Amino acid sequence: MSLLLTLIALLVSLLLFMARRRHGYWQRRGIPHDVPHPIYGNMKDWPKKRHIAMIFRDYYTKYKRSVYPFAGFYFFFTRSAVITDLELVKRVLIKDFNHFENRGIFYNEIDDPLSATLFSIEGQKWRHLRHKLTPTFTSGKMKNMFPIIVKVGEEMEKIFSAKTTTGEGQVLEIVDLVARYTADVIGNCAFGLNCNSLQNPNAEFVTIGKRAIIERRYGGLLDFLIFGFPKLSRRLRLKLNVQDVEDFYTSIVRNTIDYRLRTNEKRHDFMDSLIEMYEKEQAGNTEDGLSFNEILAQAFIFFVAGFETSSTTMGFALYELALDQDIQDQLRAEINNVLSKHNNEFTYEGIKEMKYLEQVVMETLRKYPVLAHLTRMTQTDFSPEDPKYFIAKGTTVVIPALGIHYDPEIYPEPEKFKPERFTDEAIAARPSCTWLPFGEGPRNCIGLRFGLMQACVGLAYLIRGYKFSVSTETQIPMKFVVKSILLSAENGIHLKVEKLSK
């Protein structure tokens, strides 16, 4: 018994020594950092007390005037460098991208094919896949998908019309309604499905989609292992996604491919582009083609990323417009003016002409970047001419987008909603890499133009026909779901919606 206790004591002592050794890295280098918790590192307040984006935002604010271009941080036992210098941000994302190509997050293409997305995969596989998928999001492809978005926008307008009356305000939870719009758009464009979630809030496509975002296969310690030690988790053959979620999307993609190949149907959407690459792979052209599992993963991330980010952005935009009626009126005037030039019809060219609408969306994404921090893994020692910029191989680099977006030296009065920050002149006057809701550089979001187009069309339909204002149920100031990685409103966004007379 005494021997067992001795062994346990030795093991605990060894673990504590290793933890202290890991947590002493930044101190040994003389890099400024907060004192880490013995177990949680600098993550003690997440996910129960503070949103992870707020932790990084405060870190940026605290250390931005340091003589070093980054501050030390510990994600449990993993060392990270939180970048506080814009020049280093630019080098990480663009100039010295070869040192920081990968995100260092979990994927397991063999056991968990849904996880092997363009967002997560690494190295040569990522480069090849990015090259193959880039033509899918050209202006021509966007224009081809535009009628699908407009059709769903019309359906959303009908739902709002049924829920409101002229001259009277009706309090509605906005995020759920616009999420059903984005689900139907992406269901059509990515899978060729009429999801009908606008008519049926409990449509399987949406409920499974929400589960794909929220639910994890294991939870607890294994989740910590997956997010903290992705390479080890891959060797242990762990999986991120719930089995019935994987089965659902696998079945949809398989049935969609089989149907379109059998009927030769062309819808000029995202799935058409993927099927073209699938046919090349089946014909033996692996250089230009995609396997079924590769198509499955990309269709999955297209839905998950577009569904959550666009609907959240639309919800936050309507929230800000409800708080400022002058901005809402100015936006409505622009929408009506442009539509009058296009026979009161929504056209691809007309949406491109709505510059103030674009500025509203961009300012929304400044205040509420859905993914409010970026991560990169240091592939090789980063040893520039100035030794204080040195970042060792294996260090996770964190770019605190929310901190940069709220830096008063970059955006004066950052708490205020000012769409004019995003005129061409204002953008040109700011340093680069100061607006990061879609990342920047070679690994930026490949679908950013689609996401912006989807949000702009949806907002144009709503602002044209409805007045949004705050109610007693509106949460002011905004509170976020602290346990989520993404920025999302706690308990939704409740606004008073009034139908406007035509």
Swiss-Prot record:
Signal peptide: none annotated. It is found in: Endoplasmic reticulum membrane; Microsome membrane. May be involved in the metabolism of insect hormones and in the breakdown of synthetic insecticides. GO terms for molecular function: heme binding; iron ion binding; monooxygenase activity; oxidoreductase activity, acting on paired donors, with incorporation or reduction of molecular oxygen. InterPro entries: Cyt_P450 (IPR001128), Cyt_P450_CS (IPR017972), Cyt_P450_E_grp-I (IPR002401), Cyt_P450_sf (IPR036396), Insect_CytP450_Detox (IPR050476). PANTHER family: CYTOCHROME P450 (PTHR24292), CYTOCHROME P450 6A16, ISOFORM B-RELATED (PTHR24292:SF100). Its cofactor is heme. It comes from Drosophila melanogaster (Fruit fly). Heme binds at C445. Its EC number is 1.14.-.-. This is Probable cytochrome P450 6a23. Keywords: Endoplasmic reticulum, Heme, Iron, Membrane, Metal-binding, Microsome, Monooxygenase, Oxidoreductase. PROSITE patterns: CYTOCHROME_P450 (PS00086). It is an enzyme of class 1 (oxidoreductase). Belongs to the cytochrome P450 family. It is a peripheral membrane protein. One of its GO terms (cellular component) is endoplasmic reticulum membrane. It holds the Pfam family p450.
